[in-house]
Amino acid sequence: MAKTPVRARKRVKKQVVDGVAHIHASFNNTIVTITDRQGNALAWATAGGSGFRGSRKSTPFAAQVAAERCAEMVKEFGLKNLEVMVKGPGPGRESTIRALNAAGFRITNITDVTPIPHNGCRPPKKRRV
C-alpha cells in the first residue's frame, strides 16, 4: 500500500507591532533574541552564527552584525516598536542597540536586566596569566 505524501503546512506569519529585544552580551559572544510581548521568540541571531569565530565573536562589530541579521528576520512580522532588555557586561551592549535603532525600529525603552547576586555564590578565583 502506497503512503500518501506528507505535506508541510505553510506557517502563517502573524503581524506583531510591539516587540522585545533581549540582548545577552557576554565576554565571549552576543546573543540577540527578538520576541513578542508575551515572550514568544520571533527571531534570534548570535555573533558566532554570523560568521565570527574565536576572539572575533567578542567584538562590538560582531554584535552589530548579529543585530542586523536579527532585524532582517523580524521585518516580515511588521515590527515597529522595540523594548530593549540588555543582560551581561560584554562589549556588544551599545553597538547592538545602535544597530537595532539604525534598522528602523522605534526603541521605546532600554532596561538593564543583568543579574546581580545579593552575596550568592562565591565567584571564581582571579586569573593569573
Swiss-Prot record:
GO biological process, one term: translation
A GO CC annotation given for this chain: ribonucleoprotein complex
Coiled-coil residue spans: none
InterPro entries hit by this protein: Ribosomal_uS11, Ribosomal_uS11_bac-type, Ribosomal_uS11_CS, Ribosomal_uS11_sf
Domain of life: Bacteria
Any one GO molecular-function label of the UniProt entry: structural constituent of ribosome
Keywords: Ribonucleoprotein, Ribosomal protein, RNA-binding, rRNA-binding
Family according to the record: Belongs to the universal ribosomal protein uS11 family.
Complex formation: Part of the 30S ribosomal subunit. Interacts with proteins S7 and S18. Binds to IF-3.
Role noted for this protein: Located on the platform of the 30S subunit, it bridges several disparate RNA helices of the 16S rRNA. Forms part of the Shine-Dalgarno cleft in the 70S ribosome.
Record protein name field: Small ribosomal subunit protein uS11
